[in-house]
Swiss-Prot record:
This is GTPase Era. Residues 38-42 are annotated as: G2. Monomer. GTP binds at residues 12-19, 59-63, 121-124. It is found in: Cytoplasm; Cell membrane. It comes from Streptococcus suis (strain 05ZYH33). Belongs to the TRAFAC class TrmE-Era-EngA-EngB-Septin-like GTPase superfamily. Era GTPase family. Residues 59-62 are annotated as: G3. The keyword Hydrolase does not apply. InterPro entries: G_ERA_dom, GTP-bd, GTPase_Era-like, KH_dom-like_a/b, KH_dom_type_2, KH_sf_prok-type, P-loop_NTPase, Small_GTP-bd.
């Protein structure tokens, strides 16, 4: 029996459901999710393996017009995947008309030397007539290998998309062990789970200004708990106040919710210590970006 494998990039504007799709396919949380745009900042691999094939999905940051050095990093990180994959999934939402952001991405995709599949997500939110209009509009913009409507939250038609991807795989190596599901270390996943709770619980001005640094992560041999010390970085004192909350209530809530997710992922009891620090304008300082895990070497 021949083994097939390939790399698949998931591209699109912010908030179209790329991470939701990846988590659904993997059957567990690999990429954090929130209703805030630009939640994903780093490229994240989801490694899907069966006895017959391995598909390495690369979830990318939402492509937008960058306003900071962090934004530049995110967009370049997304586009750089075009150089390293066999297929691109270009994801668009069924419930929003084609916009300038979509057109900008398609101009780059037209230059790509790999097949592009249009994935129209969130079909559960629209009438079939509206979906057909959306598909027709995009079909006129460029030549897609396939067009597949799905609902990543409900799983509608995701199996069909997976069948198409499997059909288009070439014979190849198994690049990763069968039990490995992502390329990122546990520390990265832990920091992302904490950041997800900050995004979920805080107001609009906070999300883009937050980074999470894991200062230490080790098992206590006496309690058999994993001790994690994490620092939440923000850009302004006012943001620090919001995250700490009245008498520390917000920070406690963030920690409690994050700890539950981390325990599920690690399969261990966790003692989580969280601190908040101000680092002014860190999103525009390359040294700070590298310190907080946003490194140009990634692309």
């Amino acid at each position: 029996m021949t083994f097939k494998s390939g790399f698949v990039a998931i591209l699109g504007r912010p908030n179209v459901g790329k991470s939701t799709f990846l988590n659904y396919v993997m059957g567990q949380k690999i990429a954090i999710m929130s209703d805030k745009a630009q939640t994903t900042r780093n490229k994240i691999m989801g490694i899907y393996t069966t006895e017959e094939e391995q598909i390495v999905f690369i979830d990318t940051p939402g492509i937008h017009k960058p306003k900071t050095a962090l934004g530049d990093f995110m967009v370049e990180s997304a586009y750089s995947t075009l150089r390293e994959v066999d297929t691109v999934l270009f994801m668009v939402p069924a419930d929003e008309k084609r916009g300038k952001g979509d057109d900008m991405i398609m101009e780059r995709l037209k230059q790509a030397k790999v097949p592009v599949i249009l994935v129209v997500n969130k079909i559960d939110k629209v009438h079939p007539d509206q979906l057909l209009e959306q598909i027709d509009d995009f079909r006129q913009q460029m030549d897609f290998k396939e067009i597949v409507p799905i609902s990543a939250t409900q799983g509608n038609n995701v199996n069909r998309l997976m069948e198409i991807l499997k059909e288009n795989l070439d014979e190849g190596f198994q690049y990763f062990p069968a039990d490995q599901i992502t390329d990122h270390p546990e520390r990265f996943l832990v920091s992302e789970m904490i950041r997800e709770k900050v995004l979920h619980l805080t107001r609009e001005e906070i999300p883009h200004s937050v980074a999470v640094v894991i200062e230490s992560m080790k098992r206590d041999e006496f309690t058999d708990k994993v001790h994690i010390r994490a620092t939440i970085m923000v850009e302004r004192d006012s943001q620090k106040g919001i995250i700490i909350g009245k008498q520390g209530a917000m920070l406690k809530k963030i920690g409690s919710m994050a700890r539950r997710d981390i325990e599920l992922m690690l399969g261990d009891k966790v003692f989580l210590e969280t601190w908040v620090k101000v680092k002014k304008n860190w999103r525009d300082k390359k040294l700070d970006l590298a310190d907080f895990g946003y490194n140009e070497k990634e692309y």
